Amino acid sequence: MTQKNSKLCSRANVYTQVPDGGWGWVVAASFFFIEVFTYGVIKSFGVFFNDLMDSFDESNSKISWIISICVFIMTFTAPLSTILTNRFGHRLVVMGGGLLISVGMIAASFSQRVYQMYISIGIVSGLGYCFSFLPTVTILSQYFDKRRSMVTAVASTGECFAMFAFAPAITALKEHIGWRYSLLFVGLLQLNVMVCGALLRPIIIKGPGSPKAIPLEPRREVQYMLENEKTRTSIDSIDSGVELTTSPKNVPSEAKREQEVRVEQQQTLVVGPKHSQKRAPLLDFSILKDRSFICYTLFGLFATLGFFAPSLYIIPLGISLGIHPDRAAFLLSTMAIAEVFGRIGMGLVLNREPIRKIYIELICVILLTVSLFAFTFATEFWGLMLCSVFFGSMVGTIGGTHIPLLAEDDVVGIEKMSSAAGVYVFIQSISGLAGPPLAGLLVDQSKIYSRAFYSCAAGMALAAVCLALVRPCKKGLCQNPHSGENQTDGHRGKALQDIPEDFLEMDLGKCEPRAHMKMDPV
């Protein structure tokens, strides 16, 4: 009985439509705790800065490279994470990532030189962070549709609660056991990411009209079936138990469906290599032809400058202004609590229909830019407290939604989200590598910690400009009318009723003559 239940929990969930719940709630809980042990730890790493500077006798900018390399590897290897996820599934990739995170953090506790931390935390843990975070947020978006914004926003508050808990807890722990054993303890805690990864059951969405059908094979496969009507092939999926029979009576329906709807290849059912000779592309680079996506990736590139540095430098800034270290650590906790309210509030707003989510995001980016500039004018504890609350709430509105917004039709849509997320996070790697060292360089030259926030504010201002161009590009301001492809409208068409039809992902069933013209033999 136990073995049977274990097998059921490991198999894929098959739905006729996006469930907006079900096992998705377990996936959401897993995402919450993965956020705790990934971004939560990264954003709380500032509590170790002064200890590392004293132990290694290094400058602030050199210590900043630890997180810079970590963030760079985490974002630079995003396409690799996408490829491995499409090949081996979300569960194995996330569990492997959890192991890498823990190994890197534990190894860092034994480091004798700062460059050893560049390798352990920067490269090893950074790779693990990528393998753990990106597949989780992708599969969570597949389990939800109408509730996607709200669920993702609430689940992403894990990093906020981690910042609130870790900053004072690690500060107190260091006083009793030292920073090395504190790092070791954090590394052991991060093994829980493997448990969360084990709960990520794959999901398959199949049409309600064809209960035994899986997403279509490419057109060449349909042509092959038409030429070999006596061929009967069964494809069994170990995970889902779904069987596809290509008998002659099924071939016409498959051909008709090929004319009516074009399904993205990455959504096809994944089968074992010995069962299928044709695979969907592991990474779809066609999204790079979409100008709205290019603008959105530039937004992510510049916005990353303002995401990490404030949480790294708020404690040193407070100490430099004469604030006691315990009270300075409380600033980071306050920022985390404000971020919780920002994420939940943003989820409630974006969950309303109809609403243009990209515009709400733009308003929040502008306000976040203002909050970063405000840090440079703070001179005492309560001024920093006010800035921390403002910044935390604004970064919360963006931090929990900027990746899920890729699933919106204003950017790329849910079908291409897996590849888009990989490329998007990859582009962020440049500023993830340069951001903290640039801020640290400004601090080393001026000896004023508030200068670190100038580079963050400048990057966020550029991000606002790029985000403002996303919607005009999707409407056709910068669009080449011959660059797009017709795709299914499905449930997404209602969200873009005011966009010209040339730039809609249209239902080919309504344009049947055109579909027949495109069905050339391969």
From Swiss-Prot:
Cytoplasmic side: 1-21, 84-91, 140-149, 206-298, 351-357, 402-422, 473-522
Gene Ontology CC terms: basolateral plasma membrane; plasma membrane
Record keyword Chaperone present: no
Domain of life: Eukaryota
Modified residues (Phosphoserine): S234, S237, S240, S247
Cited Gene3D superfamilies: MFS general substrate transporter like domains
InterPro entries reported for this sequence: MCT7, MFS, MFS_dom, MFS_trans_sf, Proton-linked_MCT
UniProt xrefs under Pfam families: MFS_1 (PF07690)
The UniProt record lists the keyword Transport: yes
Subunit structure: Forms functional complexes with BSG/CD147 or EMB/GP70 ancillary proteins.
Name of the protein described by the UniProt record: Monocarboxylate transporter 7
Organism: Rattus norvegicus (Rat)
Primary gene name: Slc16a6
